[in-house]
């Protein structure tokens, strides 16, 4: 009962002990378990480097509301409010490029649409990361320890496609360790084999993000978002004259018409 002061003080004391041990940030599991105002109180008291909540919901507005709710704890700075895992972006990407390995009557439970139009939200990015003022609070991901066994799980060549998106776009991207290191992992009777992993592809994408300065505030101009093709230009910031990255995902061909000196 987080309305109980004894419980509140106990949580704050525990977080203080974790910081003393060297922990820098908090990941809140099952963030729907109690009101976000209490997360705000705990964050304000402990001042982590970063905080992210697992509010498992594919609706970007509901994720925004949860983040906003953490302000109600009396937090005065946006640097201390909690972020949230961007399940809205996760499910949007999954529906585009993932065909389920789970079937019912021989039919996959989810079929990839290969239509990227849902990544264009009236000219802006889709998902929580595309909401004005929330990109620095949107922790984008391709899979995690729960989703990797679900029907929406990314497998095979779909994995680098998804990272090509989140690692070149605004948000706070994170990498699922099995995708990076490879190997077999089992949960709930489901086993996924990631072979030798995708470290080479992921390292290249992380290097691009770092060297070009792409960040949560970077500017995205979507050139194409349609069946078979997603293409966008990324500027380090909206005030920059030229894009630093051109991204193309999907089977259809596309050539950048903006910028010069592109390296594939």
Q: What residue ranges belong to the model's regions?
A:
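Active-site-proximal helices and loops of the catalytic beta/alpha 8
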Residues: 12-264
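Glycine-rich phosphate-binding "P-loop"
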Residues: 1-11, 16
């Amino acid at each position: 009962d987080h309305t109980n002061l004894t419980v509140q003080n106990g949580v704050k004391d525990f977080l203080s002990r974790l910081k003393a041990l060297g922990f820098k940030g908090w990941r809140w599991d099952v963030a729907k378990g109690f009101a976000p105002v209490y997360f705000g109180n705990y964050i304000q008291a402990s001042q982590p480097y970063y905080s992210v909540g697992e509010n498992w919901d594919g609706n970007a507005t509901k994720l925004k509301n949860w983040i906003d709710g953490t302000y109600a704890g009396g937090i005065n700075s946006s640097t201390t409010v909690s972020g949230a895992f961007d399940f809205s972006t996760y499910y949007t990407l999954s529906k585009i490029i993932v065909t389920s390995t789970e079937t019912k009557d021989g039919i996959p439970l989810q079929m990839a649409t290969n239509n990227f139009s849902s990544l264009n939200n009236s000219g802006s990015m889709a998902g929580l990361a595309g909401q004005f003022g929330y990109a620095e609070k949107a922790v984008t991901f391709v899979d995690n320890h729960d989703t990797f066994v679900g029907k929406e799980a990314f497998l095979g060549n779909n994995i680098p496609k998804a990272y090509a998106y989140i690692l070149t776009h605004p948000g706070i991207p994170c990498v699922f360790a099995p995708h990076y290191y490879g190997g077999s992992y089992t949960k709930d009777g489901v086993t996924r084999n990631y072979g030798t992993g995708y470290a080479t592809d992921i390292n290249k994408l992380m290097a691009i993000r770092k060297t070009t300065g792409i960040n949560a505030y970077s500017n995205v101009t979507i050139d194409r978002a349609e069946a078979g093709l997603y293409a966008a230009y990324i500027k380090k910031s909206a005030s920059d004259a030229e894009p630093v990255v051109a991204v193309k995902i999907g089977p259809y061909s596309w050539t950048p018409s903006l910028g010069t000196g592109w390296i594939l």
